């Protein structure tokens, strides 16, 4: 029995994992574990929630219970409710603090600091896009290497991308997951926005797939499993990703998946019936319901996931055609076919993910995890990064740029951009509240 001190205890009502009935249980928080018992005074817990592997801990009205909150773990999301709103707030605060303490190696989180451009040394240009660029930087006081995403406010305003950009910042601020890129800071100047993100240097999955033509099934299973956990976390946070493709998946220097670029995400979809209707994404990975234009939900990400798995296994997306209109026709109409080397388990999973009817599509992450294709995966060990990756990128440390396209790294890093200018005061108001500092050092 643990000798750690009890940090908090009390009754909460908990939803069952099997029959989904709600029962009052006695909860005790100690030693980084939240244990629950049939009643107060019991010695053997009915179950334990390990906070060191938990995802978000937040208020929740998804179960229509008063004073409800949820604790996400790799295996399931626990739904709990307290007697009063004050109790709920106290439980959430204590649980989050305990998790932060665990992830921070037992140290109290660092207090927020004011950060700006002058705090970073520019090292290398590592990416360029329509609204800005990505620069490898070093924070002068700590020596930590990051990716600085620099966006032009003028371009954002002119292309009506203010809402998307602020949404990306909001999503990055609230997510914390081993297979999603972390936001460490965000700040702004008169003419630019800055995201300070983890520097992930193992190369795009797209680059490795182009080099290898296709991956082994074991390698696809590993990457696919990490992507399942990342998508599950986004969906539980009310976010549809909408742009899953090899170019938006990076490998860390250790060989793990890191999902990046949340510019096309849609937030605020908390229930299974919530839908949106914007036509966006990358043609090869668009779900049929996006093409139909009648609104869509989180199921679109699982179609894209199926397309990505198919591409990793075979070398091309399932309905690929150089003629985009012909590709759309094939996505809507053509029968799914498989090369002879695709295993029965992989074929079964792909057929269920690439189901054209979103209501029939395999789109429940818990069912996906239990599919025979993933039978060898220990999901909690995977979440904790305790399963060795099948491939380690050839990089020397976390600051290496050898996997970055030389077309970028050969160009001197600079914060200047063509046609930039400061906005008027009214336009500047659109970017109020953009500044952010991650609450704890474990995000750095």
Curated annotation (Swiss-Prot):
According to its UniProt record, which reaction does this protein catalyse?
Answer: L-seryl-[protein] + ATP = O-phospho-L-seryl-[protein] + ADP + H(+); L-threonyl-[protein] + ATP = O-phospho-L-threonyl-[protein] + ADP + H(+)
Residue ranges annotated for the Protein kinase domain, each copy included: 120-374
Q: Which GO terms describe its biological process?
A: bleb assembly; cellular response to diterpene; chemotaxis to cAMP; culmination involved in sorocarp development; establishment of cell polarity; establishment or maintenance of cell polarity; G protein-coupled chemorepellent receptor signaling pathway; intracellular signal transduction
Q: Which residues form the active site?
A: 243
The lineage, from the top, is: Eukaryota, Amoebozoa, Evosea, Eumycetozoa, Dictyostelia
Underlying gene = pkbA
Please give the InterPro entries that the UniProt record associates with this protein: AGC-kinase_C (IPR000961), Kinase-like_dom_sf (IPR011009), PH-like_dom_sf (IPR011993), PH_domain (IPR001849), Pkinase_C (IPR017892), Prot_kinase_dom (IPR000719), Protein_kinase_ATP_BS (IPR017441), Ser/Thr_kinase_AS (IPR008271)
Report the SUPFAM superfamilies cross-referenced here: PH domain-like, Protein kinase-like (PK-like)
Name this protein carries in UniProt: RAC family serine/threonine-protein kinase homolog
Q: Which residues form a coiled coil?
A: none
């Amino acid at each position: 029995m643990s000798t750690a001190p009890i940090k908090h205890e009390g009754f909460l009502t908990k939803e069952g994992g099997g029959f989904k009935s709600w029962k009052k249980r006695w909860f005790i928080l100690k030693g980084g574990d939240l244990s629950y018992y049939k009643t107060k005074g019991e010695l053997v817990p009915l179950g334990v929630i390990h906070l060191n592997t938990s995802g978000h801990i937040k208020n929740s009205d998804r179960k229509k219970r008063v004073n409800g909150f949820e604790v996400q773990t790799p295996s399931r999301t626990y739904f709990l409710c307290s007697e009063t709103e004050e109790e709920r707030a106290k439980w959430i605060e204590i649980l989050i603090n305990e998790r932060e303490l665990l992830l921070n190696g037992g140290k109290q989180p660092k207090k927020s600091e004011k950060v700006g451009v002058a705090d970073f040394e520019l090292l290398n240009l590592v990416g360029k896009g329509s609204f800005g660029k990505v620069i490898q930087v070093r924070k002068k006081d700590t020596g930590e290497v990051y990716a600085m995403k620099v966006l032009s406010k003028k371009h954002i305003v002119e292309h009506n991308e203010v809402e998307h950009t602020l949404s990306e910042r909001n999503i990055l601020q609230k997510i914390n997951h081993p297979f999603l890129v972390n936001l460490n800071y965000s700040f702004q100047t008169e003419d630019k926005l800055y995201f300070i993100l983890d520097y992930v240097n193992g190369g795009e999955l797209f680059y490795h797939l182009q080099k290898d033509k296709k991956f082994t099934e074991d390698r696809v299973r590993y990457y696919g499993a990490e992507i399942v956990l990342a998508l599950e976390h986004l969906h539980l946070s009310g976010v549809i990703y909408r742009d899953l493709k090899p170019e938006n998946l990076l490998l860390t220097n250790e060989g793990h998946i890191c999902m990046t670029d949340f510019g096309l995400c849609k937030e605020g979809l908390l229930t299974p019936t919530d839908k949106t209707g914007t036509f966006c994404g990358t043609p090869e990975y668009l779900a049929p319901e996006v093409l139909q234009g009648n609104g869509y939900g989180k199921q679109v990400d699982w179609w894209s996931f199926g397309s990505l798995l198919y591409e990793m296994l075979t070398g091309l997306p399932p309905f690929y055609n150089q003629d985009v209109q012909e590709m759309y026709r094939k996505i809507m109409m053509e029968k799914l076919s498989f090369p002879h080397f695709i295993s029965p388990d992989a074929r079964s999973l792909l057929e269920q993910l690439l189901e054209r009817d979103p209501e029939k599509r395999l789109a429940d992450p818990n069912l996906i995890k239990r599919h025979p294709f993933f039978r060898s995966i220990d999901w909690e060990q995977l979440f904790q990064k305790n399963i060795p990756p099948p491939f380690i990128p050839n990089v020397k440390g976390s600051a290496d740029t050898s996997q970055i396209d030389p077309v970028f790294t050969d160009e001197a890093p600079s914060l200047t951009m063509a046609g930039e200018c400061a906005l008027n005061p009214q336009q500047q108001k659109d970017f109020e509240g953009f500044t952010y500092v991650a609450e704890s050092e474990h995000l750095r």
